[in-house]
Every structure is written in structure tokens, then in C-alpha cells.
Amino acid sequence: MSDSDNIKGVSRRTLLGTTAAAAGVGLAGGAVVTKDGAGFVSTADAQTKSAAPKAPPARPAVQKTEVAPGELDEYYVFFSSGQSGEMRIIGLPSMRELMRVPVFNRCSATGWGQTNESLKVLTEGMQPATREFLKNRGGTFMNGDLHHPHVSFTDGTYDGRYAFMNDKANSRVARVRLDVMKCDKIIELPNQHTVHGLRLQKYPRTGYVFCNGEDGVPLPNDGKVLDNPKEYHSIFTALDGDTMKVAWQVMVSGNLDNVDSDYQGKYCFSTCYNAEEGVTLAEMTANEQDWVVIFNLKRIEEAVKKGDFKEMNGVPVIDGRKGSPYTRYVPVSNNPHGMNTAPDGIHIVAAGKLSPTVTVMDVRLFDQLFDDKIKPRDVVVAEPELGLGPLHTAYDGKGNAYTTLFLDSQVVKWNIDLAKRAFKGEKVDPIIQKLDVHYQPGHNHSSMGQTKEADGKWLISLNKFSKDRFLNVGPLKPENDQLIDISGDQMKLVHDGPSFAEPHDATIVHRSKINPISIWDRADPMFADAVKQAKADGINLEADSKIIRDGNKVRVYMTSTAPAFGLEQFQVKQGDQVTVYITNIDAVEDLTHGFCIVNYGIQMEVAPMATASVSFSADKAGVYWYYCSWFCHAMHMEMKGRMFVEPKSV
């Protein structure tokens, strides 16, 4: 299929027939007989192979995509990693990976999940029941499913303070400080079972962090109710992005999927599948329509003030189910997925997924909707038919939208104004171009396209399958993130980028919005607990290398300056509870140190002018070398020392 081929006349019957067949495959064990009877293929294989004629090589870009040695990318891209649990930072247009920021995962390189500083972040926002559950399981979750990283706003554009992201696996939300590119807060959401969609308040600032609860469970979920879906409830959460505390929650009808907010600070809105509130695939896809749920922020805030809520696990929960004064439910084609606000501040687009259509709404009509002056479907101003499996929509700031078509393996460029005119009956075609991508695209994102400053230069298509696009690396294949030039009249594919499991969403931010530091401030709160303990022990972290014993608790303080640690040896007793504090006093950009104790499973990063600490039980007697694991000096190999663990028998 060529770039300019437009799929027309795709009927709902045809699409649902294909989808129903795929659903049937899932119920039957994931295999179907091929049309020629040759054998069995998986659903995913059938989709990718049917959509994947051999594509021509990527064409030269209209814009300059090469970033020469010594030059810098124009954009940061903050990528999710799905089940890997980290946030990744990519440069655009080079598509080079710049950094990985551990969040919900355990990171061997940095010690995230082992250092005291990271463990505080990972545990302080836990619910009490979870803390008890994990008490004999290492104290923290060892996995995460990081989706939807989004950067904080002021007045409708990025302000570079924070990135927020959700953990679908363990119902958490994290905040990453963009001045140091480190996670500083994680909260587990009470009452909510999974967090899928996450977006931020755009105006006047962030503000609220909006978190969709996808799956319904009994409330409280204590085992007293099990297989009774009528008593399951889904929860929508608004966090305070400054305090990382829950501001309020709303109980809704159906499963929430993706969410976005307006540019006026009045509404946020979520796609909702499973209006049937079923628990099986057949039940969840039975109805012809689901809905978009619109949340009235002012009314919800007033409800909290006047006490119109039920307190559950210490937070106010408002009843926003169908018929509530705090929400409105707009019918759309069944199982909608993506929800994306256009940079014009007027239009929002809900993608159909099981329908070839997307639904365009005008946020200026929401006031009338909540005042009951119009009906829910009256806010719909266009519903163009785009192709098979529309999932997510991005924008160029010029009135055009770009929607991924999962089943067609395409990105379709279409015009919002033309779609509105066609909706009114005018004989115009809103589709401008279709571009083959490789393969099965999910999220897509344009440069600055989620702000009022969309610049219409670049689009990334995050494709779920790569198949034949890269060297074969075995059964587990990389994803394929494809860079598309959208600066001209026609989309042009310019780059294939492999990525490990598994990006769900990304945010493209102009580099002028982000201003990280290179050397830590000694007053930074990240290691404030270490500073406090050192002060109590009479230790100057930037000068002293000493050992403090308090019963069987031993605190080892040492500086590090390449190529030497402040202590070349220290001695403890078997069974001592040891905490080692390392302060890197090299105030030199990019001179990171590491601290690793051989055969003790200890490893951590110590960045310039930072203090890092790790606690462990000295259970193995003997001599154990420690060394700097970051190559920081020509004498790197000699930057080491010995830990003596005196056996109990001595």
C-alpha cells in the first residue's frame, strides 16, 4: 500500500468481523487456520503479516536528521518503558538514547532500589496494607509497568519542573525531577486498581495529575467480596502534583482508559471501555457503544468543600457514576482508546479502536452540557472514518491531526476542519495522506504537540512490532519507534529506532524548556537524611572519613575524590548492621563515582557533590574489597579499599 492510498468505505461490520475473529482466537487459544489451510498462525502474526508488504527504504528527510559529533539534539523525548519500569530519555532527531532513569525497577548501575535514598522514595508513599504485604518480600515491589510520562505545565506549555508517570502493574504514580533527572516521589493510589491513562492539568499550571483507574474491584478490596462484579468499582484520581498527595477521587461507571485535560483548567475527560462492566472479553465488547466521561473540576472541588463525598482510606471519594452532577457521559463507538486534546484549545479526539472512526468534541460546549441545555452527543462536531484500529492522535498546530491505525499499520493525516464540514454533510474528504509504518502502531507523538506551542516538525510512531526491520536477535524482538518528518505537505518516514520492552507513550519537549544541572547542590533534599544523621554524629560529610559505632549499628562515613576513597579500610563485626555513606567531593562535571563491595551485592552511583548511602547486614566474615565501579580516573583500578568482617567466634 502506497503512502497516498486511502482506505475508504470501511464498514463497522467489516471491522468488527475482523476484531471478533481475533477475539475468538484469543478465547480459542490464540491460533487460526490460514485461508489456504496451510496451518496455524497467531493473531499477532496474522495481523503483522497481512499488513506488511515489503516497504521501500526510508526516504531522505526534508529536515536535517543527522546530529553531527559535538552537536546537540533539538528535543528531549521522555519515553516510557512499560514493563521495564524505567523512564528513558532520547534525543530527537538523532533518536539516540541519552539516559535511563530508574523509577519502578531495580537498577544495578545506580543502586536504585538498594540505596537508602531510593528506598525512601520507593516506600514512603505506600499504603499500610501494601507495606505489611511486602514486609517479608523485600520491602518493595521488584517490578513496575511504567506508562505515560508527561511533563508539567504552566499556561498550556511545558515548564520543565517535573515528569509524571504511572505504574499499571502496582497502582502507583511517580514524579521525576527534571533538574536532576531523578525520581523523587512515588505514591500508591488508594482505592484504585491499576492506573492506566495519566495526563496533567495544563492551565493555569500542574496542578492536578489525572489518573485513570482501569479495572474495577470491590471497595474495600479485602476478600469479603470476590466473584460478584456488580460490587466492583473503578476509580478516577486527581493528585496534587506539588505535594504528591491525593486531592480527590471519583467513582465512575465502566473501565477508564486514557485521559487528557483542556487548556482552560475547567475539565478533564477520559475514554471509557466496558460500559457493560463485564469481566470477560465477550461481556466487555457486547455493546455497540461505550462513552467518554467528562469531569467538571469546579463542581468536584465544590463537592469536596461541602462534604458531598465518602471518605475511603483517608481520601474523599465522590460518586461520579452515570447520572451524577459531577460528570457527563458522551456515547461513542465501543471500546474507545486514545484521548488527545488539540493545541487549538477547542477540540478533543477520542479514538475508536473497535470502530474505524474517531470522535471529535468541542470543549466550548461542555458548559452547556453540564447545565443540561444540550444532550451529550451535541458536543460531538465530527466523526471521520479513518481506517482500521485507530488508537492515538497527535497534532501539528496547523489544524491537522495524525492518528495511528493499529490494524492497518498506518498513520493517517487528516484535517479537523474538513472533518467538521464532512460531519455537517458537505462532500469533502478530511483524509490528506496515509503512511505505512512498521508495524502495528500504538501511541504517536508530535514535537511539542501536546501543548499550545505545537511546532509541526516531527512525529514519532511507537510501533508494537518490528519483525523484519532489524537484525534478528532471537524470539524476543525490539519495538520499532519510527521518526516521521511532518514539516511539509506529506509525511516522510526518516528513521527506524529499536527499543527494548516496551514503550507506552512519549513526550517530545523542546530543549529550551529543560534545564538540568550537572553538579548536585549540597543542600538538595535527595540526601537530606544522610546530612541529618551525619550532623547528629558530628561528621562533616565533605571532609570527614570516620566510623561511628552505636551498639551493633555501624555508620561508615567516607569521602571520595578520584582516585581514592577517604578510607582505605574499615572493620566491622559479623552480624553488624552497617550503613556506608559516600560523599563525592569532586565538583567536576561528569565525574561520577561508584561504590561496590565485592561478593556482598552492594553497588551504587555517587554523582558529583552528592552523598549516597547503603545499609546491609555484615553476615559474611572475611575480607571484602570495595572499589569505584565508575571509570573516573586513569588510576581507576587502584580506587579501592577493604572491608574486614570479624567473625563472631573471635
Swiss-Prot record:
<feature type="binding site">
    <location>
        <position position="148"/>
    </location>
    <ligand>
        <name>Cu cation Z3</name>
    </ligand>
</feature>
<feature type="binding site">
    <location>
        <position position="392"/>
    </location>
    <ligand>
        <name>Cu cation Z1</name>
    </ligand>
</feature>
<dbReference type="Pfam" id="PF18764">
    <property type="entry name" value="nos_propeller"/>
</dbReference>
<dbReference type="Pfam" id="PF13473">
    <property type="entry name" value="Cupredoxin_1"/>
</dbReference>
<feature type="binding site">
    <location>
        <position position="504"/>
    </location>
    <ligand>
        <name>Cu cation Z4</name>
    </ligand>
</feature>
<keyword id="KW-0479">Metal-binding</keyword>
<feature type="binding site">
    <location>
        <position position="628"/>
    </location>
    <ligand>
        <name>Cu cation A1</name>
    </ligand>
</feature>
<comment type="function">
    <text>Nitrous-oxide reductase is part of a bacterial respiratory system which is activated under anaerobic conditions in the presence of nitrate or nitrous oxide.</text>
</comment>
<feature type="binding site">
    <location>
        <position position="636"/>
    </location>
    <ligand>
        <name>Cu cation A2</name>
    </ligand>
</feature>
<feature type="binding site">
    <location>
        <position position="284"/>
    </location>
    <ligand>
        <name>Ca(2+) 2</name>
    </ligand>
</feature>
<feature type="binding site">
    <location>
        <position position="335"/>
    </location>
    <ligand>
        <name>Ca(2+) 2</name>
    </ligand>
</feature>
<feature type="binding site">
    <location>
        <position position="630"/>
    </location>
    <ligand>
        <name>Cu cation A2</name>
    </ligand>
</feature>
<feature type="binding site">
    <location>
        <position position="479"/>
    </location>
    <ligand>
        <name>Ca(2+) 1</name>
    </ligand>
</feature>
<feature type="binding site">
    <location>
        <position position="593"/>
    </location>
    <ligand>
        <name>Cu cation A1</name>
    </ligand>
</feature>
<dbReference type="GO" id="GO:0005507">
    <property type="term" value="F:copper ion binding"/>
</dbReference>
<comment type="similarity">
    <text>In the C-terminal section; belongs to the cytochrome c oxidase subunit 2 family.</text>
</comment>
<dbReference type="GO" id="GO:0042597">
    <property type="term" value="C:periplasmic space"/>
</dbReference>
<dbReference type="InterPro" id="IPR008972">
    <property type="entry name" value="Cupredoxin"/>
</dbReference>
<feature type="binding site">
    <location>
        <position position="196"/>
    </location>
    <ligand>
        <name>Cu cation Z2</name>
    </ligand>
</feature>
<dbReference type="InterPro" id="IPR011045">
    <property type="entry name" value="N2O_reductase_N"/>
</dbReference>
<feature type="binding site">
    <location>
        <position position="639"/>
    </location>
    <ligand>
        <name>Cu cation A1</name>
    </ligand>
</feature>
<dbReference type="InterPro" id="IPR041142">
    <property type="entry name" value="NOS_propeller_2"/>
</dbReference>
<feature type="binding site">
    <location>
        <position position="273"/>
    </location>
    <ligand>
        <name>Ca(2+) 2</name>
    </ligand>
</feature>
<dbReference type="InterPro" id="IPR028096">
    <property type="entry name" value="EfeO_Cupredoxin"/>
</dbReference>
<dbReference type="InterPro" id="IPR006311">
    <property type="entry name" value="TAT_signal"/>
</dbReference>
<dbReference type="GO" id="GO:0005509">
    <property type="term" value="F:calcium ion binding"/>
</dbReference>
<dbReference type="InterPro" id="IPR041114">
    <property type="entry name" value="Nos_propeller"/>
</dbReference>
<feature type="binding site">
    <location>
        <position position="147"/>
    </location>
    <ligand>
        <name>Cu cation Z2</name>
    </ligand>
</feature>
<keyword id="KW-0106">Calcium</keyword>
<dbReference type="InterPro" id="IPR023644">
    <property type="entry name" value="NO_Rdtase"/>
</dbReference>
<feature type="binding site">
    <location>
        <position position="464"/>
    </location>
    <ligand>
        <name>Ca(2+) 1</name>
    </ligand>
</feature>
<dbReference type="InterPro" id="IPR051403">
    <property type="entry name" value="NosZ/Cyto_c_oxidase_sub2"/>
</dbReference>
<dbReference type="Pfam" id="PF18793">
    <property type="entry name" value="nos_propeller_2"/>
</dbReference>
<dbReference type="GO" id="GO:0004129">
    <property type="term" value="F:cytochrome-c oxidase activity"/>
</dbReference>
<comment type="subunit">
    <text>Homodimer.</text>
</comment>
<feature type="signal peptide" description="Tat-type signal">
    <location>
        <begin position="1"/>
        <end position="46"/>
    </location>
</feature>
<dbReference type="GO" id="GO:0016020">
    <property type="term" value="C:membrane"/>
</dbReference>
<keyword id="KW-0732">Signal</keyword>
<feature type="binding site">
    <location>
        <position position="632"/>
    </location>
    <ligand>
        <name>Cu cation A2</name>
    </ligand>
</feature>
<comment type="similarity">
    <text>Belongs to the NosZ family.</text>
</comment>
<comment type="pathway">
    <text>Nitrogen metabolism; nitrate reduction (denitrification); dinitrogen from nitrate: step 4/4.</text>
</comment>
<dbReference type="InterPro" id="IPR015943">
    <property type="entry name" value="WD40/YVTN_repeat-like_dom_sf"/>
</dbReference>
